[in-house]
Amino acid sequence: MVVAAARELFCRHGYANVAMSDIATAVGIGPSALYRHFRGKQELLHAVTAEALESCLGGLTTAGRGDLDALLHEFAETSLARRELGVLWQREARNLPAEQRAELGEHLHAARRALAEQLTAARSELDHAHAELLAWSILDVAVSVSYQHVDLPAPDYPNLIADLMRRVATAELPDLGDHIADRPSTEQALEPRSRRESLLAAATRLFAERGYAAVTLEDTGTAVGIAGQSIYNHFASKHDILAAAMNRSAERLWLDLTEVLASVQDHADALRLLILRYARFALAHQHLVTLIVTETEHLQDDDRQRTLQTQRDYIDEWLHLVRAVHPAMSPAEARVRVQAVLTITNDIARTPRLRTRSGIEENVHRLGCSLLGLDDTAFVEGRTEVTPTVRSDR
């Protein structure tokens, strides 16, 4: 009962905004009684996240080799029954010590390995790199339901999620090479002369790596070689830095979208190019992507509402294109498909072992096209070229 109450509160309000007294009140006991079960909020978060991971992913690691389609359908149903997994793992588990996150992460790695084995058993032509990418992407489809707020009747919803997982599992992808230097190389890249821009870049990286709550102005100042108090010459507060970073990412995405719409006349071509441009943005700016996924809750009310509305408006542009290409598709189905594409792209961008492989941009693009029901003709920056691969299962 305590774990269930904590899970709901952490997902609804965010770990940083929930006190042990809030959890105690939710289960009708005093705070002192709660501390007899858990020594602190962090221990409770660990228990909540571990339980969610085991409940959602346990079936993958214990399943025997067999019907991949049936396994994916069962996983789709489980992911919908435990929709909190994505929020808990991607957003809230950042508040745990590194060793505990690594321990919990082994649940995901075990599930990924199990899925990769199932995929290679069903598709003997898959190499290790592609099997790993497809397995991670199937997990990301499951995680994406945490960020979906749609009303689909049963069995339509699990059938749709299972279909998306199946599209990933059967996708024929371009070459995926060895690991290359991370992008962009922070060790070799030139830095802006502007002190404000240097502070913004350093803070964005620190917020992404440690979480907003764990970073001080002194940390940011040290990263660029100035005293923490000097930051006030450029930003009024730590919150203003976060708001500036969020605004920077939003404006970049809208500029990309505007350029896409101005460069093509066909909705399908626009959607293909938008998938590519979003993948390019995410892979090059993984720290900004991390802030979008994990730190929005730390914005002050006005900035948070403005940021969320901007994100909703941006996604609505994707939905408009999807439904222009597929007029019979319901708004709810289009939203589920788009969220799956964005979640896969974001997670790959935030996962070094995937992000740093040569050819990853083209692979992400192909997966996105498959999930949105586009053919294998890749529209690339103003020209159409047919890639020499086998079609995805449609």
PLM feature segments, named:
Residues 3-4, 16-17, 37-61, 196, ...:
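An amphipathic alpha-helix adjacent to DNA-recognition modules
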Residues 98-123, 132-133, 302-327, 335-336:
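Amphipathic alpha-helical packing segments from all-alpha helical-bundle domains
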Residues 122-187, 325-369, 379-384:
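Hydrophobic/aromatic-rich alpha-helical bundle segments in the mid-to-C-terminal region
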Residues 139, 185-253, 342, 346-349:
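Conserved small-residue-rich
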